[in-house]
Protein backbone atom coordinates (compact mmCIF):
# COMPACT_ATOMS: atom_id res chain seq x y z
CA UNK A 1 0.00 0.00 0.00
CA UNK A 2 0.99 3.57 -0.45
CA UNK A 3 0.11 6.71 1.39
CA UNK A 4 -1.87 8.35 -1.34
CA UNK A 5 -0.69 11.78 -0.36
CA UNK A 6 2.89 10.84 -1.22
CA UNK A 7 2.96 12.69 -4.42
CA UNK A 8 6.10 12.73 -6.45
CA UNK A 9 8.49 9.81 -6.39
CA UNK A 10 11.60 10.04 -8.56
CA UNK A 11 13.83 7.29 -9.87
CA UNK A 12 17.26 7.36 -11.46
CA UNK A 13 17.79 11.08 -11.09
CA UNK A 14 20.46 12.34 -13.46
CA UNK A 15 21.21 15.87 -14.51
CA UNK A 16 22.62 17.56 -17.54
CA UNK A 17 22.15 15.97 -20.88
CA UNK A 18 21.35 17.89 -23.95
CA UNK A 19 22.15 21.08 -22.06
CA UNK A 20 19.74 23.52 -20.50
CA UNK A 21 19.97 25.89 -23.43
CA UNK A 22 19.64 29.64 -23.12
CA UNK A 23 16.47 29.68 -21.09
CA UNK A 24 14.57 30.91 -24.14
CA UNK A 25 11.77 29.48 -26.23
CA UNK A 26 13.48 30.74 -29.38
CA UNK A 27 15.54 27.59 -29.84
CA UNK A 28 12.73 25.15 -29.10
CA UNK A 29 11.09 23.08 -31.81
CA UNK A 30 8.45 20.82 -30.29
CA UNK A 31 7.01 17.66 -31.82
CA UNK A 32 4.55 15.07 -30.63
CA UNK A 33 4.19 11.52 -31.93
CA UNK A 34 0.90 9.67 -31.40
CA UNK A 35 0.97 6.10 -30.12
CA UNK A 36 -1.66 3.75 -31.54
CA UNK A 37 -4.40 6.39 -31.55
CA UNK A 38 -4.96 9.78 -33.08
CA UNK A 39 -5.30 13.36 -31.87
CA UNK A 40 -9.09 13.01 -31.92
CA UNK A 41 -9.24 10.15 -29.40
CA UNK A 42 -10.70 12.42 -26.66
CA UNK A 43 -8.07 10.91 -24.42
CA UNK A 44 -4.30 10.62 -24.10
CA UNK A 45 -3.20 11.71 -27.57
CA UNK A 46 -5.74 14.50 -27.93
CA UNK A 47 -4.98 16.02 -24.54
CA UNK A 48 -1.24 15.94 -25.18
CA UNK A 49 -1.67 17.41 -28.65
CA UNK A 50 -4.02 20.22 -27.65
CA UNK A 51 -1.93 21.20 -24.64
CA UNK A 52 1.37 21.19 -26.54
CA UNK A 53 -0.15 23.11 -29.44
CA UNK A 54 -1.65 25.75 -27.14
CA UNK A 55 1.58 26.13 -25.16
CA UNK A 56 3.68 26.38 -28.31
CA UNK A 57 1.43 29.02 -29.84
CA UNK A 58 1.48 31.06 -26.63
CA UNK A 59 5.27 30.88 -26.46
CA UNK A 60 6.09 31.39 -30.12
CA UNK A 61 7.46 27.88 -30.53
CA UNK A 62 7.24 25.71 -33.64
CA UNK A 63 5.04 22.66 -33.06
CA UNK A 64 4.15 19.68 -35.23
CA UNK A 65 2.66 16.27 -34.60
CA UNK A 66 3.34 13.00 -36.33
CA UNK A 67 1.14 9.93 -36.64
CA UNK A 68 2.98 6.64 -37.26
CA UNK A 69 1.87 4.74 -40.36
CA UNK A 70 1.31 1.57 -38.34
CA UNK A 71 0.85 0.49 -34.73
CA UNK A 72 4.40 -0.88 -34.43
CA UNK A 73 7.59 0.11 -32.65
CA UNK A 74 9.27 0.46 -36.04
CA UNK A 75 6.63 2.89 -37.27
CA UNK A 76 6.82 4.94 -34.08
CA UNK A 77 10.62 5.10 -34.42
CA UNK A 78 10.25 6.19 -38.04
CA UNK A 79 7.92 9.00 -36.95
CA UNK A 80 10.54 10.14 -34.45
CA UNK A 81 13.16 10.07 -37.22
CA UNK A 82 10.84 12.21 -39.32
CA UNK A 83 10.33 14.70 -36.49
CA UNK A 84 14.07 15.07 -35.87
CA UNK A 85 14.75 15.45 -39.60
CA UNK A 86 12.23 18.30 -39.61
CA UNK A 87 14.12 20.07 -36.83
CA UNK A 88 12.38 18.94 -33.65
CA UNK A 89 14.55 19.11 -30.55
CA UNK A 90 11.83 18.40 -27.97
CA UNK A 91 9.65 15.35 -28.59
CA UNK A 92 6.56 14.41 -26.57
CA UNK A 93 5.76 10.69 -26.53
CA UNK A 94 2.39 9.91 -24.87
CA UNK A 95 1.92 6.33 -23.74
CA UNK A 96 3.73 3.25 -22.48
CA UNK A 97 4.12 2.01 -26.07
CA UNK A 98 6.96 4.50 -26.48
CA UNK A 99 9.24 2.67 -24.05
CA UNK A 100 10.77 0.83 -27.01
CA UNK A 101 11.37 4.12 -28.80
CA UNK A 102 13.08 5.64 -25.78
CA UNK A 103 15.35 2.60 -25.55
CA UNK A 104 16.11 2.76 -29.28
CA UNK A 105 16.25 6.48 -30.01
CA UNK A 106 17.50 8.45 -27.03
CA UNK A 107 21.13 7.49 -27.67
CA UNK A 108 20.70 7.99 -31.42
CA UNK A 109 19.64 11.61 -30.88
CA UNK A 110 21.55 12.87 -27.80
CA UNK A 111 20.74 16.52 -28.58
CA UNK A 112 16.98 15.94 -28.60
CA UNK A 113 14.99 16.10 -25.37
CA UNK A 114 12.51 13.23 -25.04
CA UNK A 115 9.46 13.35 -22.75
CA UNK A 116 7.80 9.99 -22.10
CA UNK A 117 4.30 10.41 -20.69
CA UNK A 118 2.98 7.34 -18.88
CA UNK A 119 6.27 5.53 -19.49
CA UNK A 120 7.52 3.90 -16.31
CA UNK A 121 10.54 2.03 -15.05
CA UNK A 122 8.97 -1.33 -15.79
CA UNK A 123 8.13 -0.36 -19.36
CA UNK A 124 11.71 0.73 -20.04
CA UNK A 125 13.23 -2.34 -18.41
CA UNK A 126 10.93 -4.68 -20.32
CA UNK A 127 11.97 -3.22 -23.67
CA UNK A 128 15.59 -2.78 -22.68
CA UNK A 129 16.12 -6.26 -21.26
CA UNK A 130 13.99 -8.10 -23.78
CA UNK A 131 13.83 -11.89 -23.53
CA UNK A 132 14.39 -13.08 -20.00
CA UNK A 133 12.95 -9.99 -18.32
CA UNK A 134 11.67 -10.92 -14.85
CA UNK A 135 8.95 -8.24 -14.76
CA UNK A 136 10.51 -6.89 -11.59
CA UNK A 137 12.27 -3.63 -12.46
CA UNK A 138 14.02 -3.69 -9.09
CA UNK A 139 16.22 -6.45 -10.53
CA UNK A 140 17.73 -3.99 -13.02
CA UNK A 141 19.31 -0.56 -13.34
CA UNK A 142 16.83 1.17 -15.63
CA UNK A 143 19.41 3.76 -16.63
CA UNK A 144 21.37 1.07 -18.45
CA UNK A 145 18.73 0.86 -21.17
CA UNK A 146 18.24 4.42 -22.35
CA UNK A 147 19.94 7.81 -22.32
CA UNK A 148 18.91 9.37 -19.03
CA UNK A 149 20.66 12.64 -19.89
CA UNK A 150 18.12 13.67 -22.52
CA UNK A 151 14.98 11.94 -21.24
CA UNK A 152 12.24 12.74 -18.71
CA UNK A 153 9.46 10.27 -17.95
CA UNK A 154 6.28 10.67 -15.93
CA UNK A 155 3.80 8.12 -14.70
CA UNK A 156 0.64 8.81 -12.73
CA UNK A 157 -0.96 7.53 -9.56
CA UNK A 158 -4.04 6.39 -11.45
CA UNK A 159 -5.25 4.45 -8.43
CA UNK A 160 -6.16 7.79 -6.83
CA UNK A 161 -8.39 9.11 -9.62
CA UNK A 162 -9.82 5.61 -10.09
CA UNK A 163 -10.59 5.53 -6.37
CA UNK A 164 -12.34 8.89 -6.51
CA UNK A 165 -14.46 7.77 -9.48
CA UNK A 166 -15.54 4.56 -7.75
CA UNK A 167 -16.20 6.41 -4.51
CA UNK A 168 -18.29 9.03 -6.30
CA UNK A 169 -20.31 6.41 -8.19
CA UNK A 170 -21.41 4.57 -5.06
CA UNK A 171 -22.02 7.79 -3.12
CA UNK A 172 -24.20 8.98 -6.01
CA UNK A 173 -26.41 5.94 -5.54
CA UNK A 174 -25.10 3.42 -8.06
CA UNK A 175 -24.87 -0.10 -6.69
CA UNK A 176 -24.09 -2.25 -9.74
CA UNK A 177 -20.89 -0.99 -11.31
CA UNK A 178 -18.70 -2.15 -14.17
CA UNK A 179 -15.05 -1.71 -15.09
CA UNK A 180 -14.06 -2.10 -18.74
CA UNK A 181 -10.31 -1.74 -19.06
CA UNK A 182 -8.37 -1.54 -22.29
CA UNK A 183 -5.43 -3.88 -21.81
CA UNK A 184 -4.16 -5.19 -18.47
CA UNK A 185 -1.13 -2.91 -18.42
CA UNK A 186 -0.03 -1.26 -15.14
CA UNK A 187 -1.72 2.13 -15.67
CA UNK A 188 -5.08 0.55 -16.53
CA UNK A 189 -4.80 -1.89 -13.66
CA UNK A 190 -4.07 0.93 -11.22
CA UNK A 191 -7.18 2.75 -12.44
CA UNK A 192 -9.27 -0.39 -12.07
CA UNK A 193 -8.00 -1.50 -8.69
CA UNK A 194 -8.36 2.05 -7.40
CA UNK A 195 -11.94 2.10 -8.70
CA UNK A 196 -12.73 -1.08 -6.78
CA UNK A 197 -11.18 0.33 -3.61
CA UNK A 198 -13.13 3.57 -3.96
CA UNK A 199 -16.42 1.77 -4.45
CA UNK A 200 -15.65 -0.37 -1.42
CA UNK A 201 -14.80 2.63 0.78
CA UNK A 202 -17.98 4.47 -0.17
CA UNK A 203 -20.05 1.33 0.43
CA UNK A 204 -18.44 0.91 3.84
CA UNK A 205 -19.14 4.55 4.69
CA UNK A 206 -22.78 4.05 3.70
CA UNK A 207 -23.09 0.64 5.37
CA UNK A 208 -24.11 -1.08 2.15
CA UNK A 209 -21.15 -3.31 1.19
CA UNK A 210 -23.52 -6.23 0.70
CA UNK A 211 -25.44 -4.30 -1.93
CA UNK A 212 -22.54 -3.20 -4.17
CA UNK A 213 -21.14 -5.28 -7.03
CA UNK A 214 -18.42 -4.51 -9.56
CA UNK A 215 -18.23 -6.46 -12.83
CA UNK A 216 -14.60 -6.35 -13.99
CA UNK A 217 -13.10 -7.10 -17.41
CA UNK A 218 -10.41 -6.01 -19.87
CA UNK A 219 -11.18 -5.61 -23.54
CA UNK A 220 -7.72 -6.64 -24.70
CA UNK A 221 -7.43 -3.49 -26.83
CA UNK A 222 -7.78 0.29 -26.62
CA UNK A 223 -10.74 0.71 -28.94
CA UNK A 224 -14.33 -0.44 -29.04
CA UNK A 225 -15.75 -2.94 -31.50
CA UNK A 226 -18.75 -5.22 -32.00
CA UNK A 227 -17.44 -7.93 -29.65
CA UNK A 228 -16.84 -5.54 -26.78
CA UNK A 229 -20.15 -3.77 -27.38
CA UNK A 230 -21.88 -7.15 -27.19
CA UNK A 231 -20.25 -7.83 -23.83
CA UNK A 232 -21.38 -4.43 -22.59
CA UNK A 233 -24.89 -5.10 -23.89
CA UNK A 234 -24.95 -8.15 -21.63
CA UNK A 235 -23.80 -6.12 -18.65
CA UNK A 236 -26.27 -3.27 -19.09
CA UNK A 237 -29.26 -5.23 -20.38
CA UNK A 238 -29.01 -8.66 -18.74
CA UNK A 239 -27.07 -8.00 -15.55
CA UNK A 240 -28.54 -4.56 -14.84
CA UNK A 241 -25.18 -2.83 -14.57
CA UNK A 242 -25.87 0.87 -14.03
CA UNK A 243 -22.54 2.54 -14.79
CA UNK A 244 -19.32 1.36 -16.46
CA UNK A 245 -15.89 2.91 -16.02
CA UNK A 246 -14.57 2.72 -19.60
CA UNK A 247 -10.83 2.83 -19.02
CA UNK A 248 -8.81 2.61 -22.21
CA UNK A 249 -8.79 5.45 -24.71
CA UNK A 250 -11.39 4.83 -27.40
CA UNK A 251 -12.86 1.73 -25.76
CA UNK A 252 -15.52 4.02 -24.30
CA UNK A 253 -17.41 3.76 -27.61
CA UNK A 254 -18.52 0.21 -26.83
CA UNK A 255 -19.66 1.10 -23.33
CA UNK A 256 -21.49 4.19 -24.57
CA UNK A 257 -23.20 2.33 -27.42
CA UNK A 258 -24.50 -0.29 -25.01
CA UNK A 259 -25.45 2.26 -22.35
CA UNK A 260 -27.43 4.30 -24.86
CA UNK A 261 -29.82 1.39 -25.47
CA UNK A 262 -30.96 1.25 -21.85
CA UNK A 263 -30.25 4.70 -20.44
CA UNK A 264 -27.09 3.51 -18.72
CA UNK A 265 -24.19 5.62 -17.48
CA UNK A 266 -20.46 5.75 -18.28
CA UNK A 267 -17.36 7.04 -16.48
CA UNK A 268 -14.60 8.45 -18.68
CA UNK A 269 -10.83 8.29 -18.28
CA UNK A 270 -7.60 10.29 -18.64
CA UNK A 271 -9.32 13.56 -19.55
CA UNK A 272 -12.86 14.92 -19.18
CA UNK A 273 -14.55 12.70 -21.77
CA UNK A 274 -18.08 13.99 -21.16
CA UNK A 275 -18.26 16.01 -24.38
CA UNK A 276 -17.57 12.87 -26.41
CA UNK A 277 -19.47 10.29 -24.36
CA UNK A 278 -22.55 12.49 -23.99
CA UNK A 279 -23.02 12.45 -27.77
CA UNK A 280 -24.34 8.92 -27.23
CA UNK A 281 -26.90 10.06 -24.67
CA UNK A 282 -27.71 13.20 -22.74
CA UNK A 283 -25.91 13.34 -19.39
CA UNK A 284 -24.51 9.84 -19.89
CA UNK A 285 -21.17 10.69 -18.27
CA UNK A 286 -21.21 10.51 -14.47
CA UNK A 287 -17.60 11.73 -14.16
CA UNK A 288 -14.13 11.07 -15.57
CA UNK A 289 -11.07 9.72 -13.75
CA UNK A 290 -8.53 12.23 -14.99
CA UNK A 291 -4.78 12.45 -14.88
CA UNK A 292 -2.88 15.65 -15.44
CA UNK A 293 -1.39 15.25 -18.87
CA UNK A 294 -1.97 18.92 -19.55
CA UNK A 295 -0.28 19.97 -16.32
CA UNK A 296 2.68 17.71 -17.06
CA UNK A 297 3.13 18.98 -20.62
CA UNK A 298 2.92 22.60 -19.48
CA UNK A 299 5.32 21.93 -16.61
CA UNK A 300 8.05 20.28 -18.66
CA UNK A 301 7.84 22.59 -21.69
CA UNK A 302 8.00 25.63 -19.43
CA UNK A 303 10.99 24.15 -17.60
CA UNK A 304 12.83 23.66 -20.88
CA UNK A 305 12.00 27.20 -21.97
CA UNK A 306 13.26 28.55 -18.65
CA UNK A 307 16.54 26.64 -18.85
CA UNK A 308 15.64 24.19 -16.09
CA UNK A 309 15.89 20.92 -18.01
CA UNK A 310 18.59 19.67 -15.62
CA UNK A 311 15.94 19.52 -12.87
CA UNK A 312 14.01 16.92 -14.87
CA UNK A 313 16.51 15.01 -17.01
CA UNK A 314 16.85 11.38 -15.99
CA UNK A 315 13.85 11.37 -13.68
CA UNK A 316 10.91 9.00 -13.76
CA UNK A 317 8.30 10.85 -11.71
CA UNK A 318 5.16 9.30 -10.24
CA UNK A 319 2.69 12.19 -10.20
CA UNK A 320 -0.37 12.35 -7.98
CA UNK A 321 -1.68 14.80 -5.41
CA UNK A 322 0.27 17.83 -4.30
CA UNK A 323 -2.49 19.92 -2.72
CA UNK A 324 -5.92 20.07 -1.11
CA UNK A 325 -6.84 22.18 -4.15
CA UNK A 326 -7.94 19.70 -6.89
CA UNK A 327 -6.86 21.86 -9.82
CA UNK A 328 -3.24 21.71 -8.65
CA UNK A 329 -3.17 17.91 -8.63
CA UNK A 330 -2.12 15.47 -11.33
CA UNK A 331 -5.08 13.16 -10.58
CA UNK A 332 -8.61 14.49 -10.21
CA UNK A 333 -12.29 14.47 -11.22
CA UNK A 334 -13.74 17.24 -13.44
CA UNK A 335 -15.63 19.55 -11.11
CA UNK A 336 -17.56 21.29 -13.90
CA UNK A 337 -19.11 18.16 -15.42
CA UNK A 338 -19.30 15.54 -12.65
CA UNK A 339 -22.95 14.84 -11.86
CA UNK A 340 -23.00 16.01 -8.26
CA UNK A 341 -26.22 15.38 -6.32
CA UNK A 342 -27.36 17.19 -3.20
CA UNK A 343 -27.65 14.86 -0.25
CA UNK A 344 -25.56 12.19 -1.96
CA UNK A 345 -22.21 13.48 -3.23
CA UNK A 346 -21.57 17.16 -3.83
CA UNK A 347 -18.67 19.28 -4.98
CA UNK A 348 -18.05 20.09 -1.32
CA UNK A 349 -17.95 16.37 -0.53
CA UNK A 350 -15.39 15.93 -3.31
CA UNK A 351 -13.22 18.69 -1.86
CA UNK A 352 -13.31 16.90 1.48
CA UNK A 353 -12.39 13.61 -0.21
CA UNK A 354 -9.39 15.24 -1.85
CA UNK A 355 -8.35 16.71 1.49
CA UNK A 356 -8.68 13.33 3.21
CA UNK A 357 -6.56 11.59 0.57
CA UNK A 358 -3.92 14.29 0.43
CA UNK A 359 -3.75 14.47 4.20
CA UNK A 360 -3.38 10.71 4.58
CA UNK A 361 -6.71 10.03 6.30
CA UNK A 362 -7.59 7.78 3.37
CA UNK A 363 -4.89 5.51 1.96
CA UNK A 364 -5.06 3.78 -1.42
CA UNK A 365 -3.02 0.78 -2.50
CA UNK A 366 -1.11 0.90 -5.78
CA UNK A 367 -0.40 -2.84 -5.66
CA UNK A 368 -1.41 -4.53 -8.92
CA UNK A 369 -0.19 -8.05 -8.17
CA UNK A 370 -3.74 -9.09 -7.24
CA UNK A 371 -7.27 -7.73 -7.08
CA UNK A 372 -7.71 -5.68 -3.88
CA UNK A 373 -9.25 -7.45 -0.91
CA UNK A 374 -12.60 -5.74 -0.41
CA UNK A 375 -15.98 -6.30 1.24
CA UNK A 376 -18.09 -5.57 -1.85
CA UNK A 377 -18.58 -8.22 -4.54
CA UNK A 378 -16.17 -8.17 -7.50
CA UNK A 379 -16.69 -10.50 -10.47
CA UNK A 380 -13.45 -10.67 -12.48
CA UNK A 381 -13.93 -11.96 -16.03
CA UNK A 382 -10.34 -11.63 -17.21
CA UNK A 383 -10.18 -10.36 -20.78
CA UNK A 384 -12.72 -10.35 -23.61
CA UNK A 385 -9.92 -10.85 -26.14
What are these regions (language model features)?
Residues 10-13:
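C-terminal motif of bacterial Sec signal peptides marking the signal peptidase cleavage site
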Residues 22-385:
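A residue-level marker of the well-folded mature domains of exported/periplasmic proteins
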